[in-house]
């Protein structure tokens, strides 16, 4: 009975609970829908725009707008604001447009784009800003545009492209920078980070030198037309191994150096029309294995021996389009003829001449080395290595490379590099070879007395250009078509003597010469030092003589200006003269042996001496003055040295 009651209560509870749970779920769903509708707001099209496709496409063109209109539906995927008068894009203007994929702002008057102007556009893949007044690239505004694929900045007065200008949009695949006519500077790192870029337009940007495009490893199409660079040098397209289309039209190109296109292994289309090209280096297009479309028209081609290889190449690889590649401009009798119609029978051509042949070289291991091979610029250069490998400028080797001028460069030589290296120079009339022997020795320690770089005399038999011209006659052509001349012409070999494969050891004669040179240097040094010491001593002696002469002159001047000095010493013990003696000779005759001394004055008191203008000893016994002229002499100075013993009187 109890069990039956429990089962009845359980079924009753379930019957009541299930409707309550169902009603609660329905209420929650209804509330969520109301909240979503309230947050989305009403989907109304702005009055100045036209909307279609359930508000996913909004067009507001040519409405004279000065700012982005309010109330753009949140589900908009395509927004066109072109041809208005918008001058500034403020931050968070499009924050609510999370589904926007295409934003067209071209042909406005936009001068400033604030940082954060495109916040919220997580789905944006195309941004058009062409034909505006931007002077700088708004790099800060591109933040968080993680899905951006296309960016159009064409025809803006942008003056420079700084480093890392687009590193915030690594997803970019198409970048249009054409017609930047105010552009003056492109940084070396301007395109860093754009490893996904497929298309780049730099046409009509007043570019004078090819910018650094190495970071664009995935680039497939490059537009460079309408610029002003007269030369295309090797390395201009370095790193663009994926490039398929290259347009360089109307850029005043007058010279393309050999090996200029060596890195473009994937190139399919090349347009060089409307330039100033008159000739091209031999085998310029040989590395372009996939090239099928070539445009060379509207160039002043000079149809001579340097153009024969191009005529043959056009017939072989582009036989279906004879008008693609222009006509002869010179000489006069060839003017107007298509390049593919130029025949070698009309010219007298000779094999190339090697102007600077390589020389034998002895060098130690782990050093850098070069073997030069200077040739005419319109010829092609290849090197034959000792192991049979043929190396050109386009070849890739870890340590050995062919430079633009034909030089074979070793970044680091090893013992296995020892052998004969042959420079092979080719043009349409034939080829010329020159060989050199490279001897690599093992590096030895503790050898400071001599260098591994030794001069080796090489006897080279050179052939003059006249002999080559006389020896080589035009290669006959068959009726079936032109054949490459280097398959039938004779090789011109410049013989060079080989150096035995011994390690260079310093000889006794070399050591003696080095010692003699050292002795001569020491002698010269000693002579210079001796001359310096002699000049110094001579100057010192002259200075001493001058000093002595000057001192003697000063002493003579002092003696001349001095007067006589009289020193009188008087002994105080001499007795005074008797009065009788003074009167004993009135007639002036003195007594026997009598000495008459002057009266000694009291020198202690100067005033007692001063009144005596005439000394009494100046008169004789007759009363006549012995010195009548000395009556106005000033009184002498009195110097007392001792008051009791001696008195010194000095008259100056």
Curated annotation (Swiss-Prot):
Residues 41-526 are extracellular. Residues 548-652 are cytoplasmic. The keyword ATP-binding does not apply. Keywords: Cell membrane, Disulfide bond, Glycoprotein, Immunoglobulin domain, Leucine-rich repeat, Membrane, Postsynaptic cell membrane, Repeat, Signal, Synapse, Transmembrane, Transmembrane helix. It is a single-pass type I membrane protein. Residues 299-351 form the LRRCT domain. The last 4 C-terminal residues bind to the first 2 PDZ domains of DLG4. Synaptic adhesion protein. Regulates the formation of exitatory synapses through the recruitment of pre-and-postsynaptic proteins. Organize the lamina/pathway-specific differentiation of dendrites. Plays an important role for auditory synaptic responses. Involved in the suppression of glioma. Interacts (via LRR repeats) with NTNG2. Interacts with DLG4. Forms a complex with DLG4 and with NMDA receptors. PANTHER family: ANTIGEN BSP, PUTATIVE-RELATED, LEUCINE-RICH REPEAT-CONTAINING PROTEIN 4. This is Leucine-rich repeat-containing protein 4. It comes from Mus musculus (Mouse).
